[in-house]
Amino acid sequence: LSTEVAVTEHDIVAAATGRPHIELTTEAAQIRELRAAIEGNQLPDLYVTSGEVVHLERVSGDISTPLGLPDPPPLPYAPSVLTSAGLASLLARHAYAFQVRTRTRKGKNGESDETIEQEIETVPSNRVLAAVLAGRYWPGVRPLHGIVGSPVLRPDGTLLQTAGYDAKTGLFFAPKVELPWVPAEPKLLEVAEAQKFLCETLLGGFPWVAPADRANYLGLLVSNILRPYVRTLTPFGLITATTQASGKTILSEGIGLLYGQRVLPWPETESELRKAITSALGEAASVLVFDNLREGTVIDSPNLALLLTTPEWSDRRLGTNTTVQIANDRLWLGTGNNLRLGGDIATRTVLVRLDPKMPHPEERTGFAIPHLDLWVKDPANQRTVLRHLLVLVMDWIASGAPRAEHVMRQFTPWARAVGGFLAHHNIDGFLANVDEVRAMDDEDNEWEVFLGQWHRKFESKPKTAAQIRASADIDIDNHGRPHDPWEGCFLADERGGVPSAKSLGRTLRGQVGRFHGPYVLRRGEDPHRKIATWSVGCPDGP
């Protein structure tokens, strides 16, 4: 028994030209045909992300800068959600969509009428195109989990270094610079050269405050390569200095230009920050930098704190009422002078500090690479840095990828992997400046001072908010001079004065059980008056 499959003329032409031929008949048939073409990967460069079909294409042109210099796009490719217009464009360029129209030619001189069929190239109506794209289930369409501009480490420990789509990870590798192949087991000489170049030649001239700052920077530098392997979030990288021209932007560009960056201004409000985050995550940039924050800025943002600990960012798509969900698979950096931290940001931050200890740091010498600010912008030099970094990564993998014992809240897998990588290459000091990070949290410092004075005055005796507030009233000593019984350590309200008992009670409720230094606030209840009482505990005290 045999079955014959009819081969049409259009099948033959489609095979010869590489363009599928799609006959457009009824609307229902058109929807089925076009969905089949998408699910059968007959149209190029289509992928699915979070249930939406996206088209991945090259980015043309540069962004003009105020100086007229080109600012290249973060990555040479970018995805966009496929719209009706986008699908029509793809069909026109990569398929032959047609309708068959018939007309009758009247016969002359007694001849019979002639029916003529004619193919008309066309595209479906907007209603059909919208119906095709309405679904969220796309079997057969390759998932796109992200675009990377450098080789990355797959979950199995192999290095993705072939340009294009990688089925093992769902990533599309769009190289920013061409690299020679990196072996799975680099030679010892290669490893030694890479260590010396990165630690001495590239970074040796920076005025690090302590070894921890250089180690933390190298940890941030390697994070994008390790991300698919470690499969975890990365903390906020804060690069701060005592004065301008210390090298902050060179360091941030050293990371961002390697992987593809977008530089952002620091928004003034939480709503503006949320919009900036959503917009930035929609771009094909692996590193997002809040550059040159105003000196002394206190980074205390609930939205940033949420972003750093959520693998998927959810927000309303700009200009619409629809919600967009975007993978938070980026490295976030901030730079500025004498920056401070507040809220939950300190526990989500890796600190890099610079202190040139001179009045005009722009005049200093000693860099092994002259004009380093220009050097890092050259793709050939980015290739050099990336090659050395990858050699160290593969040497670490070849040695079993040993982990360190660091603990860092939600970022512990990242800290253990990066710490192990650095320790393997004898780079000391990673995360050793945690105390300095805590000291940058002004709010935490204020609470520690307040609770410490409370504990010295009342030990762990329960007090009501009204009693605590009354204890802050200014006394007059025997010489008629005002005396502050709290010695300036009491909490202040928004106007800088002492808060009311009611306001103080509300403030205390938000701090129950949270340690500030060695002190912790506890809540109780007066059994007779049925009102809240407060006490301060200390591990070294009662």
Predicted regions and their residues:
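DNA transaction DNA-binding modules
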Residues: 240-243, 261-262, 274-278, 286, ...
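Conserved catalytic/switch belt of AAA+ P-loop NTPases
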Residues: 301-324
